[in-house]
Regions:
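A glycine-rich helix N-cap at a beta->alpha junction
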Residues: 73-100, 105-106, 113-116
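N-terminal catalytic cores of NTP/NDP-binding nucleotidyl/phosphoryl-transfer enzymes
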Residues: 3-12, 16-79, 194-227
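Active-site cores that bind ATP or allylic diphosphates and position pyrophosphate for catalysis
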Residues: 63-65, 71, 108-270, 328, ...
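Core subunits and conserved enzymes of cellular information-processing
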Residues: 230-234, 238-240, 304, 308-311, ...
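Long, charged, mostly alpha-helical binding arms that flank functional sites
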Residues: 250-327
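Secondary-structure transition/capping motifs at alpha-helix termini
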Residues: 16-19, 48-56, 82-89, 217, ...
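Conserved short loop/turn motifs at secondary-structure junctions
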Residues: 28-32, 60-68, 91-100, 123-124, ...
């Protein structure tokens, strides 16, 4: 549930004053790309506030720009909201559903002398408006056309008599305003492109700043909450509402975007990464997209926990991605069952163990006491095992507590073994490690009371499965990608080690039944999930630990 913040304070005041009786919010993404972690903040705010106040939450696909939108993105957005558990109880709508009403309201403004058809080009219009708020503006030569002439031209625009850019419908507001958005903004433009829902019915389309408040009002939205870059657009939002509907609601309010380290949120950049083949699609586990995070192994709970901890304010800030990692790590530590995986295997042969024998040890699925999981599983033990290469050293460094020549170590959940010899390949690399097991230590400590400090994991060579394990890291080396030097190429900051593929890994055989969406802790290694696209591949969700301390 949403915490108290400045947005809920506004809503509380509106309810207390009797201005509204039911809260109605919406999430209005443009279907021209995939949702990302920043989108999750907007979803969470609108969905959770509606939930908190027993109100309604709409999903509206803002498909008013036919050139960039498509069903692929529409379907992905709906799927992402469902996955997050933020299903819109108020319904799913499309901006294009309101094209007829938008057109009628545009004609209303024209008839009232509040809108006019302009012949200036985009560049001329910008120059006449003053280019920026610090320069004076001057009226278009076409500003004083009569309502009758404007209505005729607007209808001819709709009929397809003019080329793109030849005519534009502008609101007649205030050319002297210090707010550029009120200097007679464009509210309709000509665009010859097939719409994914409307086909070729329309060749004129409403601008976002005109369509958005109309859509909000028609749907009964009470609080139109959007990101901070729309704050200067609020006076125009209010102008549209007042001049078309004559009401005080909907009310637009703004919050700061969610910016995260070591990634980019720009749809243009993300699309470029996909189209150039730098990443494996929009759902590449390194991407900040929700489908990418899902494939990586993140959960809806961890994402919404991260958004809530990041806070809701009007101040821009940069959130360390390690805070997101901390959220999923805390969750999986309690929920993920433990399994054994050897990523860089070397053969360990227990010489005093029968070749034809297979023994099964009961191993805890989750030894974390807070998980309250008392279940166990059977893990096969045989004469030949696989252990991690790094868990053996012929010449150990100081404080090395794993297996050494002549040294002892505990095989996790099984016997204590002592290394007796090593077989080597012609190039000097280790082919196999030989050891003997203290066969009296399968269920406890040595009878003579000797202490064995090291414990390593292992899998049976005869009862394991082969897999590829992908170790994912941050996509960019630069923490603040919004602050890279002007003119530099963001791709120069790509992390060359953002994914390391480990092949020939040996995994506990119980993982043969694992499905995409399942989460596991590979003991001593990290948290992993089966890849949804490639059978036999596991993706690292997050490492076991990190020095980062999340904000409280």
């Amino acid at each position: 549930m949403a915490d108290k913040n400045f947005l809920t304070d506004i809503i509380d005041a509106d309810l207390a004053e009797g201005k509204i009786r039911e809260i109605h919010t919406r999430f209005p993404p443009e279907p021209n790309g995939y949702l990302h972690i920043g989108s999750a903040k907007a979803i969470y705010i609108n969905w959770s506030i509606a939930n908190q106040y027993g109100g309604k939450f709409n999903l509206r696909l803002d498909d008013t720009n036919p050139a960039r939108e498509g069903e692929e993105y529409v379907n992905s957005i709906i799927e992402d909201l469902h996955w997050l558990g933020a299903d819109p109880n108020g319904g799913i709508f499309y901006g294009s559903d309101y094209f007829d009403q938008c057109y009628e309201y545009a004609e209303k403004l024209i008839k009232e002398g509040k809108a006019y058809v302009d012949d200036l080009s985009r560049e001329e219009m910008r120059e006449y408006r003053g280019a920026d708020a610090g320069k004076p503006s001057r009226p278009s030569p076409y500003r004083d056309r009569t309502p009758e002439e404007n209505l005729d031209l607007f209808r001819r625009m709709r009929a397809g008599e003019f080329k793109e850019g030849e005519k534009t419908l502008r609101a007649k507001i205030d050319l002297a305003s210090p707010n550029m958005n009120l200097r007679d903004p464009a509210i309709y433009r000509i665009k010859y492109a097939e719409h994914h829902r409307q086909g070729n019915k329309w060749c004129i389309y409403p601008m976002y700043d005109f369509a958005h408040p109309i859509q909000d009002a028609i749907e009964g939205i009470t609080h139109s909450m959007c990101s901070l870059e729309f704050e200067n657009h609020r006076p125009l939002y209010n102008w549209v509402i007042e001049n078309i509907f004559g009401t005080a609601f909907p009310k637009q309010r703004e919050f700061a975007r969610l910016n995260m380290t070591n990634t980019v949120m720009s749809k243009r950049y993300l699309r470029e990464l996909v189209e150039m083949g730098i990443v494996d699609g929009w759902d590449d586990p390194r991407m900040p997209t929700l489908c990418g995070l899902r494939r990586r192994g993140y959960t809806p709970t961890s994402i919404f926990t991260f958004v809530r901890e990041a806070g809701i304010s009007k101040s821009d800030n940069l959130i360390d991605m390690r805070q997101l990692e901390a959220c999923i790590r805390s969750e999986l530590d309690l929920t993920a069952q433990r399994r054994i995986a050897v990523l860089d295997p070397v053969k360990l042969i227990v010489d005093n163990y029968p070749e034809d024998k297979t023994e099964y040890f009961d191993v805890a699925n989750n030894p974390n006491r807070e998980a309250n999981d008392t279940t166990t599983r059977k893990v096969a033990f045989t004469r030949e095992l696989w252990i991690e290469n790094e868990d053996f050293a012929e010449v150990p460094p100081p404080k090395f507590k794993r297996l050494t020549l002549g040294g002892e170590v505990r095989l996790m959940g099984a016997y204590i073994v002592k290394c007796t010899s090593v077989d080597k390949n012609p190039d000097g690399s280790i082919a196999a490690i030989h050891c003997t097991a203290d066969l009296e230590t399968g269920n406890g400590n040595p009878a003579d009371g000797r202490k064995v400090k090291g414990t390593i994991h292992w899998v049976s060579a005869a009862r394991c499965i082969d897999a590829e394990v992908r170790l994912y890291d941050k996509l960019f080396t630069e923490a603040n990608m919004n602050a890279i030097p002007e003119g530099s190429d963001y791709k120069d900051y790509l992390n060359p080690e953002s994914v390391v593929a480990c092949t020939g890994c040996k995994l506990e055989e119980s993982l043969k039944d694992a499905k995409p969406g399942d989460k596991f802790q590979f003991v001593r290694t990290g948290f992993f999930t089966p890849d949804s696209k490639n059978p036999g591949v596991y993706n690292r969700v997050v490492t076991l630990r990190d020095s980062f301390k999340p904000a409280k």
